[in-house]
Curated annotation (Swiss-Prot):
Gene3D superfamilies: IHF-like DNA-binding proteins. This protein is one of the two subunits of integration host factor, a specific DNA-binding protein that functions in genetic recombination as well as in transcriptional and translational control. GO terms for cellular component: cytosol. It holds the Pfam family Bac_DNA_binding. Transmembrane segments: none annotated. SMART domains: BHL (SM00411). InterPro entries: Hist_DNA-bd, Histone-like_DNA-bd_CS, IHF-like_DNA-bd_dom_sf, IHF_alpha. This is Integration host factor subunit alpha. Residues 53-69 have a biased composition (Basic and acidic residues). It comes from the Bacteria. Belongs to the bacterial histone-like protein family. It comes from Vibrio campbellii (strain ATCC BAA-1116). One of its GO terms (biological process) is positive regulation of bioluminescence.
Amino acid sequence: MALTKAELAENLFDKLGFSKRDAKETVEVFFEEIRKALESGEQVKLSGFGNFDLRDKNERPGRNPKTGEDIPITARRVVTFRPGQKLKARVENLKADQ
């Protein structure tokens, strides 16, 4: 199961006493700020969580799996996420506890 934006907003409502509307808006604004930073080419660093980076990928050869035809995969920019040490440690501890 995945954590959704709606569940994040519900947690803000339950744990911090935000109104449901304010909780939803807070979650939307948070993600919009991350989007804007990435769109303008900035790295996003969330201390204790991880970093969102932009990476340019070069054009490379590919193959159509149905026909076997060689086709070029165009150059593109992708978003990558590198978890921070604290997040890695917590996830590793979860595996050890289970």
